[in-house]
Amino acid sequence: MSLKTSFDENIKQKHKIEKPKMYKVILHNDDYTTMEFVIEILINVFNKVPANAVKITFDVHKNGIGIAGVYPYDIAATKINEVKKLAYKNGYPLKLTMGEV
């Protein structure tokens, strides 16, 4: 037992943990999705406070795109899929894309 313990103590392990690549979730403007729906998804899916959700919504309306948030790939993809399902269920053609930061 002591042999194993001394052996384990002599092993130097270097664990290099890399930060995951981050991706921005981009909302695209369209002529059909209501601003109220966009604000709702920003609050409920992307956990934005109402004032920030309104600002992002106006960015989308004014500039054609807006950043909903920045996340690791899996989280960004999950949020995009969740919003696409909600948009489809509510009859909106809301487009979201993802871009590496």
Curated annotation (Swiss-Prot):
InterPro entries linked: ClpS (IPR022935), ClpS_core (IPR003769), Ribosomal_bL12_C/ClpS-like (IPR014719)
Gene3D superfamilies: 3.30.1390.10
Chain's role: Involved in the modulation of the specificity of the ClpAP-mediated ATP-dependent protein degradation.
Assembly, per entry: Binds to the N-terminal domain of the chaperone ClpA.
Family the entry assigns: Belongs to the ClpS family.
SUPFAM superfamilies: ClpS-like
One GO term of the biological process aspect: proteolysis
Protein name as catalogued: ATP-dependent Clp protease adapter protein ClpS
Gene symbol of the encoding locus: clpS
